[in-house]
Amino acid sequence: MIVIFLGPPGAGKGTQGKKIAKKIDLPHIAVGDIFRTIIKTSTSEAELINNYVKQGALIPNEIVNQVIKVFLLSSKYKNGYILDGYPRNLEQAKFFEAFIQKPQIKIIYFDVADELLIKRVLGRYSCKNCGKIYNIHFLQPKIEHVCDVCSSSVFDYRKDDNKEVIKKRIKVYKTETYPLIDYYKNSGNFYIVNANKNEQEIENDIQKILKIN
């Protein structure tokens, strides 16, 4: 089974992707994390991608498509996965469908208010060791400065997150992705979750969609 999580930055896709992936025993692929890893390398591709990210612009389709294609060729994804953050527009969706040639896809769209998105994105950070996501407003570690999962005390605050860049990313996202939502609505496998809810409520709604006990 392939599950696609669609939604703007800060909608909660990454948090839910990790939790649901464990429940259905499928890998969670966070496309944003893939590109952040590439950016850390000393290559011309990394520099090019980083320029788009800093401006709040979407990375060109031809770059995204090829990176995802190479990534998904790994044998560990042959039985399915949760794909978080891709495709983001019609061109990417059609490329993806032609590449995978599998009919069993479920698309879940995270619908959330812009004001809440901005607050979530500005407040989020993660454990540098295990990747557990936290938020200064909504989800702090149980013990201050100690990760709940791995007990690390080293955290990563994303440098590309500031209010103006986030607003631009949301605007660009809507322009690019709303036509994709209309496209998927007619697929018969498109679902909407209210991502204004709290983390547990969103997880419960996704479990119902995927029929997880």
From Swiss-Prot:
Keyword hit for Cytoplasm: yes
Annotated stretches, region: LID: 123-161
Binding site residues for AMP: R36, A57, L58, I59, G85, Y86, P87, R88, Q92, R158, R169
Pathway, per record: Purine metabolism; AMP biosynthesis via salvage pathway; AMP from ADP: step 1/1
PROSITE patterns: ADENYLATE_KINASE (PS00113)
Binding-site residues for ATP, renumbered to this chain: G10, A11, G12, K13, G14, T15, R124, I133, Y134, K197
Catalytic activity, EC: 2.7.4.3
First-tier enzyme category under EC: transferase
Superkingdom: Bacteria
Substrates-to-products reaction catalysed: AMP + ATP = 2 ADP
Keyword entries, A-Z: ATP-binding, Cytoplasm, Kinase, Metal-binding, Nucleotide biosynthesis, Nucleotide-binding, Transferase, Zinc
InterPro entries in the cross-refs: Adenyl_kin_sub, Adenylat/UMP-CMP_kin, Adenylat_kinase_CS, Adenylate_kinase_lid-dom, P-loop_NTPase
CDD domains registered for this protein in UniProt: ADK (cd01428)
Binding site for Zn(2+): C127, C130, C147, C150
Compartment list: Cytoplasm
BP terms from Gene Ontology: AMP salvage
Self-association state and partner proteins as the record states: Monomer.
Family of this protein: Belongs to the adenylate kinase family.
HAMAP family: Adenylate_kinase_Adk
Domain text: Consists of three domains, a large central CORE domain and two small peripheral domains, NMPbind and LID, which undergo movements during catalysis. The LID domain closes over the site of phosphoryl transfer upon ATP binding. Assembling and dissambling the active center during each catalytic cycle provides an effective means to prevent ATP hydrolysis. Some bacteria have evolved a zinc-coordinating structure that stabilizes the LID domain.
Function: Catalyzes the reversible transfer of the terminal phosphate group between ATP and AMP. Plays an important role in cellular energy homeostasis and in adenine nucleotide metabolism.
Designated name of the protein: Adenylate kinase
Organism: Rickettsia prowazekii (strain Madrid E)
Biological classification of the source: Bacteria, Pseudomonadati, Pseudomonadota, Alphaproteobacteria, Rickettsiales
